[in-house]
Structures are given as structure tokens and as C-alpha cells.
């Protein structure tokens, strides 16, 4: 909300996000929330490989905790974060490509696309390295930067 207000002051009031812009913002926000669950459960320590989680794409523990599985099972939390992150990357890339067609959103669109690729690669690196605190913190900071760049892009090109 603070970033959006700052953008309103700097560039004038923008319409509410809609369409692919809303989708990009929503999936980035959900990815951050899923990442918070991973961090809170130390779920990144379970499967330090990518794209597989043990012997397959889905961990063997998936669904063990029933209805609360997403919130109580570290393996499921990591699984969800991985695949929501893939969706976030694809959505931000699609929205960024669309935003780059308009002169007012070209720069933020390009930066958001670059950042989503950096963030995705950093997430995999953090996992493969066994989640060192320095890289984990950098990955969390990257999430904030990605959210800010996505907000900026949506503000300049809300469709």
C-alpha cells in the first residue's frame, strides 16, 4: 500500500489493477506467503535438490496431514512454494512482455522480468546450497524487490 501510494504521488493516481496485472500481483503475493511458510517451518532443509523432491516431482509426504497439510507439512509447503513460484515467474514474464509495448511501463516491465528470473534462480541456488542464512536473507529481500517492481509495472500499465 505504501509503494502504491508513493507511485500515485510520483506518477499520478492509477486505476486499480485488473487482468494480467492483477494476476501477476496476486501470484507474486501468494508466492511470498508460501515462502514465509517454508521459512517458518525450515522446509527448505528437507529437499535440497531441484526440480525433483526425492524420487519425484511430488514429495512422498505430500498430503500426510490432511486438510491442514499445506500449513503443517514442511514437504508440502516446499512443494507449494516451488510450483507457485513457477506460476509467478511465467505470469510476471507474460505481463512484463505486454507492459513493454507501452512507453510508460517499458522500464518497470523489463526490470520486473529481470528480477523474477533472478529471484527464481536465487531460490533454486538457496535450495541447492542447503539454505545458508545469507542466501536465504537475500532471497527474502529479492521477494520484496520483485513485489515492488511488479507493483510499479502494474501502476504504469494496469491491464
Where are each of the predicted segments found?
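Polytopic transmembrane helical bundles with strong interfacial aromatic enrichment
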Residues: 1-159
Amino acid at each position: 500500500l505504501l509503494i502504491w501510494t508513493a507511485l500515485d504521488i510520483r506518477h499520478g493516481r492509477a486505476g486499480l489493477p485488473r487482468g494480467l496485472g492483477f494476476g501477476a500481483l496476486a501470484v507474486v503475493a501468494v508466492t511470498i506467503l508460501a515462502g514465509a511458510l517454508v521459512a517458518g517451518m525450515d522446509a527448505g532443509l528437507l529437499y535440497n535438490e531441484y526440480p525433483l523432491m526425492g524420487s519425484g516431482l511430488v514429495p512422498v509426504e505430500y498430503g500426510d496431514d490432511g486438510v491442514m497439510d499445506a500449513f503443517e507439512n514442511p514437504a508440502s509447503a516446499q512443494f507449494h512454494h516451488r510450483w507457485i513460484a513457477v506460476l509467478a515467474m511465467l505470469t510476471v514474464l507474460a505481463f512484463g512482455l505486454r507492459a513493454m509495448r507501452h512507453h510508460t511501463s517499458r522500464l518497470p516491465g523489463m526490470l520486473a522480468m529481470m528480477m523474477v528470473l533472478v529471484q527464481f534462480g536465487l531460490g533454486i541456488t538457496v535450495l541447492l546450497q542447503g539454505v545458508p542464512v545469507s542466501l536465504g536473507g537475500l532471497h527474502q529481500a529479492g521477494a520484496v524487490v520483485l513485489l515492488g517492481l511488479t507493483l510499479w509495472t502494474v501502476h504504469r500499465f494496469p491491464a
